[in-house]
Amino acid sequence: MELTQQVKRLKMQKNNFLNQYYELESYISKIAPNRIEQYKKNIENIEKDIEVAKKYHTDDFHIKVLDKYDSDTRAEANKIIRNIQPSYKNERKIASYQGFDIILDRKSVYSHQTMIIRGNYDYEFEFSGSTNIMYQIDKIIEYGILEELKTFKRRLEFESRKFTTAKTELNPDFPHENELIKKQARLSELNQKLSA
């Protein structure tokens, strides 16, 4: 009876081991390479946006909203942008500013709306009626893009280490295989004797 329980336990351990093995194999062959490739692409795009931000950076303020409202002050631009109603499309380009497209996104939560600063990569923030929108946009262009770059570099480093570790740990051999084979053989032998 105890031998039967030991064999059942070892079979369960082997099934768990094989499930983990196949998950790790999938991670190594598909998931990790795709993530690493995406992180590298994001880093490359964000680095391009940093160059755009440097190129267009100026202390003079000017923004053209909806191709018809010119504004030379942040306060006036805030007022114009705040009064734009989200369109029935998901996204609506409302302005170009310092080399980036400013997009109003229809997805909203309660009294908040989403704004996207689009370059080679998208930088999102939510705002409500009281938000200083131009301050948020300036802050993202000046600091947020660099923070996003740091975040993806950390993710890439972490994922690369995890990928390397996973490759060294991948082993299809169940560590208790010999024990399982011996106990199964012994159990079969006992069952044959009991049947006779």
Features from the language model and the residues they span:
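Mid-to-C-terminal oligomerization/interaction "stalk" domains of large proteins
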Residues: 1-27, 87-196
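Extended, charge-rich alpha-helical segments
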Residues: 48-103, 185-194
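C-terminal accessory region of SF2 helicases/translocases
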Residues: 1-70
